[in-house]
């Protein structure tokens, strides 16, 4: 039963984030100065973590963020990033480029809650969920060896260094457990995957983990936190056990971590 770690990070701040303008997929804004500092801070925080794979949305703000993170890495500075359109932000149609207040007004006029409302030309919540599920199924199959030969699937040399490097950054008791092997013994990670994506997309993905895969949460966390928007460069870590022809099991180690932002930017709520 292969086991892997999944670290999911939201992109750094853009000027439009600060101004509460909907970006979606059609407004491809770069990071602001604050956003670049956030990416560097996240990279410094994760600098001792060994990743075997790196994936990012193909939009500018996520590309700049993942490169800012990897630049600080002791082990992954030269790692190739795979850009995947399945990791893009939710498409908001006619609301893109407009203030969040206008989207809320559209939703109110339609008699719907804003997170569930689909603007004309936008993606439904279910469509975003299916994109997330498709990507997650892909990485599970990648780890199971179905995407090619084993030697090409795990380019980053899996081994005991993966779990020890994670445990240094996310110590047991502070951020929850890195997960005991259900069959006993060591954690035995086959891979450690870094993903950089977007706020609404990540909320949908985490909701899928909770509702469909029955993700277990660290002690003090609740379901509301899993369904909230991740702050810019907020870090969430999951441990996944995958097995052929069976639903993966998933454990949340930490959710929306932002302690690396102390002194970089005000915490976002």
From Swiss-Prot:
Disruption phenotype: Mice are viable and fertile and show no obvious developmental defects. Following intestine ablation by gamma irradiation, adult mice display a reduction in the size and number of proliferating intestinal crypts and an increase in cell death. Mice display reduced intestinal tumor progression compared to wild-type mice.
Alphabetical keyword list: Apoptosis, Autophagy, Cytoplasm, Hydrolase, Mitochondrion, Nucleus
Location(s) in or outside the cell: Cytoplasm; Nucleus; Mitochondrion
Biological role: Fructose-bisphosphatase hydrolyzing fructose-2,6-bisphosphate as well as fructose-1,6-bisphosphate. Acts as a negative regulator of glycolysis by lowering intracellular levels of fructose-2,6-bisphosphate in a p53/TP53-dependent manner, resulting in the pentose phosphate pathway (PPP) activation and NADPH production. Contributes to the generation of reduced glutathione to cause a decrease in intracellular reactive oxygen species (ROS) content, correlating with its ability to protect cells from oxidative or metabolic stress-induced cell death.
Subunit structure: Interacts with HK2; the interaction increases hexokinase HK2 activity in a hypoxia- and HIF1A-dependent manner, resulting in the regulation of mitochondrial membrane potential, thus increasing NADPH production and decreasing intracellular ROS levels.
Residue numbers annotated as active site: 11 (tele-phosphohistidine intermediate), 89 (proton donor/acceptor)
Induction: Up-regulated by hypoxia in cardiac myocytes in a p53/TP53-dependent manner. Up-regulated in ischemic cortex after reperfusion in a p53/TP5-independent manner. Up-regulated in primary neurons by oxygen and glucose deprivation (OGD)/reoxygenation insult in a p53/TP5-independent manner (at protein level). Up-regulated in ischemic myocardium in a p53/TP5-dependent manner. Up-regulated in small intestine after gamma irradiation damage.
Molecular functions (GO terms): fructose-2,6-bisphosphate 2-phosphatase activity
Phylogenetic placement of the source organism: Eukaryota, Metazoa, Chordata, Craniata, Vertebrata
Record family assignment: Belongs to the phosphoglycerate mutase family.
One GO term describing the cellular component: mitochondrial outer membrane
Name of the protein this chain belongs to: Fructose-2,6-bisphosphatase TIGAR
Site for Transition state stabilizer, residues: 198
Expression tissues: Expressed in olfactory bulb, cerebellum, and cortex. Expressed in neurons and astrocytes (at protein level). Expressed in intestinal crypt.
Entry's EC annotation: 3.1.3.46
Gene that specifies this protein: Tigar
């Amino acid at each position: 039963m292969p086991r892997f770690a999944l670290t999911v990070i939201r992109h750094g701040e853009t000027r439009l984030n600060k101004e509460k303008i909907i970006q979606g997929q059609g407004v491809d804004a770069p990071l602001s100065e604050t956003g670049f500092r956030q990416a560097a801070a996240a990279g410094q925080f994760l600098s001792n973590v060994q990743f075997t794979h790196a994936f990012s949305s193909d939009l500018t703000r996520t590309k700049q963020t993942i490169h800012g993170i990897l630049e600080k890495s002791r082990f992954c500075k030269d790692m190739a990033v795979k850009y995947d359109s399945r990791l893009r932000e939710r498409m908001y149609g006619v609301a893109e480029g407009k203030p969040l207040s206008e989207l809320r007004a559209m939703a109110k006029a339609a008699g719907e809650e804003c997170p569930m409302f689909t603007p004309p030309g936008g993606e439904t919540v279910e469509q975003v969920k299916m994109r997330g599920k498709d990507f997650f199924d892909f990485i599970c199959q990648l780890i199971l060896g179905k995407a090619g030969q084993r030697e090409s699937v795990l380019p980053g040399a899996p081994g005991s260094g993966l779990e020890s490097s994670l445990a240094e950054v996310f110590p047991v008791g502070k951020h929850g457990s890195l997960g005991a092997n259900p069959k006993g013994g060591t954690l035995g990670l086959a891979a450690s995957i870094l993903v950089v994506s977007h706020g609404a997309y990540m909320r949908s993905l985490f909701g899928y983990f909770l509702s469909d895969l029955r993700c277990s949460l660290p002690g003090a966390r609740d379901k509301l936190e899993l369904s909230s928007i991740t702050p810019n460069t907020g870090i969430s870590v999951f441990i996944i056990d995958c097995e052929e022809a069976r639903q993966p099991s998933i454990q949340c180690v930490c959710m929306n971590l932002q302690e690396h932002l102390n002194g970089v930017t005000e915490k976002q709520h």
